[in-house]
Amino acid sequence: MLISTFFIAITHPTKYKLIMIFYFSCTGNTRWAAHKIAEATGDTLIDIAAELRKADEEDATDKKRTFSYTLSADESLAFCFPVHGWRPPLAVRDFIRRLRISKTTDNYCYAVCTAGDTVGEAMDIFEADLAAVDIKTDSCISLLMPESYVGLPFMDVDKAEAERRKKTEADRRLQDFIADIKCHKAGIHDITAGRWPRINSRLIGEAFTKWIIGDRPFRVDAETCIKCGKCAAVCPVGDISFMKGSTPQWKHNGKCLSCFACYHHCPTRAIEYGGR
């Protein structure tokens, strides 16, 4: 499974105690989860993809630019991320490496990952990235969501009934987790790692990162494309250029996550990938 989303709940340096949920969403699976949590907690949603793009627009050459936030003693820290090839996506890992949290105590921290299948050691990898910036999770969960990765011949979206079952079960488990995080419950590690978590994340995941993830196989059927620009608008890493009246073009800049947001959001199914 490759796709899903990212969020982090923290506060900007301000005199007000406003906790935010920073989310990263591609096809919408974890946007749904982030909104569910925000509805239950009253927290504010911030789009991490927009934050990353804004940083690039200001100075794309500054790869050492940090994202700094301040936490008060009574505020929580939370993360939710997509699983790409049994790993956290590259954009999320880049953000975490550049994240700086100013805190005076060990604030309560939880993490959520979403995937269409098992997650392998994705959470372990993510927690190691957090540890490198002095953050430790107290509880974590993985949610099984509708499949969105279609990049290989044997992988496809779920049938309608399977999708319905996944959504129902994910909603039930998320509601239970929300009740736990509201009271800062620690020690929850409800992760569907799968049968071969290390092989999937370390070996196959490395192969995905090196040889499969990328924008080269994407193309547009010019006759079907209505030139609406939706694909460029939904790309979380800004890898698609679009000018009114023209067909979209991929930038081949190494940022593509193979999240298939463009593929799934195209209203006329004009975007193709490989033989699909």
Describe the residue ranges of each PLM region.
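Aromatic (phenylalanine/tyrosine) cluster motif
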Residues: 6-7, 16
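Glycine-centered signal
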Residues: 11-13, 60
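FMN-binding flavodoxin-like domain, especially the glycine-rich phosphate-binding loop
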Residues: 13-51, 68, 72-81, 85-207, ...
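Intrinsically disordered, low-complexity terminal tails and inter-domain linkers enriched
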Residues: 55-66
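Charge-patterned, long linear interaction tracts outside catalytic cores
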Residues: 204-229
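Iron-sulfur cluster-binding cysteine motifs and their immediate structural context
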Residues: 220, 226, 230-257, 261-276
